[in-house]
Structures are given as structure tokens and as C-alpha cells.
Amino acid sequence: MSLALNPVAFNLGPIQVKWYGILMATGVLVATLMAINEGKKRQIMPDDFIDFLLWAVPIGFIGARIYYVVFEWGYFSQHPDQIIAIWNGGIAIYGGLIAGLIVLLVFCHQRMLPPFLMLDIIAPGVMAAQVIARWGNFMNQEAHGAKTTLSFLESLHLPHFIIQQMYIDGSYYQPTYLYESALNLVGLILILSLRHRKHLFKRGEVFFSYVIWYAAVRFFVEGMRTDSLYIANTIRVSQALSLILFFGAIILWVYRRKVIKPKWYLAGSGLKYPYNRD
């Protein structure tokens, strides 16, 4: 296997630096730069995003690990020494997103920042980070789907290096990481191209759009994966949560449009953008 497909990018003495970590760090960096750039248009200082990042990243990782441990408690209850062994793998993005959301709400309260505005600013960057970080699963040959055939993968007109990386232990597998990354990229392009159109999105609705899109994508892709976390060995956790988020975001969107109409929320309020800070 070529170096480009080796999960280890390089070594620093005894420490292995893996592509997974590099791609995750790249995703965080891209998300931060996107938020800072958009924040300048909304009168949010760059320091606010940096300070938020310093709290959100470590707590997000802790949340991602706790989420995984909770739904794999049958194993970790017998191996408690492995609970903190995050270097062996085992984090769940939904856990990280939930933890990050909690941090954001607390942070906005302390800084007196409008939370839905911050969510609108940050959401596209989070989606971009997800697009990038999923390729870490590709490098690790994990988070894939069921067995498939070489002819099927070739019918997708995938680059040769992707097909070869999907050859694991003598069989080819569905590149579900690629499906999720590609679909999220489509969603990201749509959101970025539409979010500044006047009267299309009110405050909070860029965030709702992200939640609805990602929940739908994750529900679809999760049904193809072979490493899902389960509730009672029957219900896929991520699919159940995706349904809750999908319909929850739609309900909140409609509720805010129909019931809650503060000055900054109304179309034609004279603001440059419907979700500008005021």
C-alpha cells in the first residue's frame, strides 16, 4: 500500500501522527476560519470564536467519547480501563455535536451573544469540517458499509485509490464515508449559496437547514453501515437521533415562523440581512 493510503502520516519519535487526526484538525481549522470570516459581517469579534473553540474542541471530544461509551456500555462495563483509551478509537460525532451545542449556549449566555446568530454563523463551518474529517475514516478503512463487488465500485466511476482502499481483508466494501462526505458537500454548497439571500433565511434557519440536511444524510448512510451503535440490539442510535433532529428542526422552524416574530426576525425590518446582530 502506498504512503498516501497509510493511516499513519508520519512519526514523531515513538508517537504516530495519523491522517485521521490531521484531517480532523484541518476540519476544525477550516470551520474556525469560516466562522471568523462570516462573523466579521455580523459584528462578532474573532476573539469570540477563538475563545469558544478553546472550550468546544476538548469538551466536544469528551462528549463524543461519552456518547460512544454509553451505547457500548456492555463492553466498557467489563473493561473500565478502556473508557479513556480514546487512542484506540471510539468516538461518535453526534456526541461531539451535542456537547458543542451545550458549550455554545453557555458561552453565548456568558458573552451576551445571540445564540441563534452564532449557530447560523458556525453551522456551515461544522458541515465543512464533517466533509473533511470523514476522509479520516477512509484512511483508517473504517465506518464502511456492507460487502460489495469490484464491479459495483467501478460502476460508480471512483478513482482507483478509493476502490483499492475499500479492499479490506479480502473483500470490497461500500464506501459509506464517501457517500456522507459527498452529500454533505452538496448541502454545504447549497447553504453557502443561499444563506445571504434576503428574506429567505431568518435568524436560526441556516442552522435548522444544516440540522435537517445532516440528519437526513446520516439516517440514509447509517442504514448502510456495519458498525452502528444500537439500542437493545435493534434500533440504530444514530438513525433514531437523526429522526428526532430532522423533525425537531422542522417543527422549531415552523413554530418560529408562525408564532415567534421579534423585530429582528421579521422580513422587511430594515436590516441588511434578516439575521444580522442588533
Swiss-Prot record:
The enzyme's E.C. designation: 2.5.1.145
Subcellular location: Cell membrane
One GO-annotated biological process of the protein: lipoprotein biosynthetic process
Binding positions for a 1,2-diacyl-sn-glycero-3-phospho-(1'-sn-glycerol) per the UniProt entry: 134
Domain of life according to the entry: Bacteria
Pathway membership: Protein modification; lipoprotein biosynthesis (diacylglyceryl transfer)
Membrane topology: Multi-pass membrane protein
Main location: membrane
Example of a GO MF term: phosphatidylglycerol-prolipoprotein diacylglyceryl transferase activity
Segments passing through the bilayer: 19-39, 49-69, 83-103, 112-132, 174-194, 204-224, 235-255
Keyword terms: Cell membrane, Membrane, Transferase, Transmembrane, Transmembrane helix
Entry GO terms, CC: plasma membrane
UniProt record similarity statement: Belongs to the Lgt family.
HAMAP family, per database record: Lgt (MF_01147)
NCBIfam families, sorted: lgt
Function: Catalyzes the transfer of the diacylglyceryl group from phosphatidylglycerol to the sulfhydryl group of the N-terminal cysteine of a prolipoprotein, the first step in the formation of mature lipoproteins.
Protein name from the UniProt record: Phosphatidylglycerol--prolipoprotein diacylglyceryl transferase
UniProt organism field: Lactobacillus gasseri (strain ATCC 33323 / DSM 20243 / BCRC 14619 / CIP 102991 / JCM 1131 / KCTC 3163 / NCIMB 11718 / NCTC 13722 / AM63)
Gene: lgt
